[in-house]
Amino acid sequence: IKPLVGDNVEIEVIDKDNFKGNVVDILPRKNELIRPASANIDQAMVIFAVKTPEPNFNLLDKFILMMNYQDVPTVVCFNKEELADDEYKNELKKKYEGCGCECIFISAKNNIGIDRIMEVLKGKTTVLAGPSGVGKSTLTNLLIPDMEEQGEVSQTGEVSRIGRGRHTTRHSEIYNVCKQTYICDTPGFTSLNLPDVEKEDLRFYFEEFVPFEGKCRFNGCMHVSEPGCAVKQAVEDGIINYDRYKSYTDIFEEIKNKKKY
């Protein structure tokens, strides 16, 4: 069995003074994430910037899909909140709370919202994920003042001229924030492979669709082109966010085309 970040292990101490030992056993896992590769995770916190770089919502929706597929709750955190007005932030909050995620706005640069982040993290093991350049490393350094004692300080990277972040976290690493509270910091990503979900099952991982299951004209409606679809009607009525539905249809087509080859 291959060790993963977040594993609980049994060790054989070989140098007590210098805290050195060998792993002799990996204890049973309560869960195992494919990506980010980790184990014993309570929740995921995905971090995007509200601007600079502009958020890729399709990428965010894919991440939420991946976590739903792996039965891991997701907290959506938007950094650089000072760059957006209240109307835009309220739209984002409504959009992502509508799909079952807690939505938090922070400014790592100005130390705003960090107390709320600590409340959400407390007593849990949380995977931190997000694209490069969104301020994830800056946030990690704020959450763990003694990071240098635990390992390397996360280097922060500026956003490049083309608006994409530069990777700063090179590998996944787990840190102790406070008592019984851990974060698993992961490298930034610019793309995500879809989980191994069938297109017929995709709808079950979009939580805002769940109240409309069984209300469509046809059993097994996939909410794409079928007439009498309750989900499409909910989109027209403004009950389901249009952009989230568009992400669903885009991912549906991606899965369908992937299965052809």
Language-model features, listed with the residues they occupy:
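Conserved beta-strand elements of the Class I
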Residues: 45-46, 127
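Short, glycine-rich nucleotide/cofactor-binding loops
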Residues: 48-57
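Histidine-anchored nucleotide/phosphate-binding helix
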Residues: 58-68
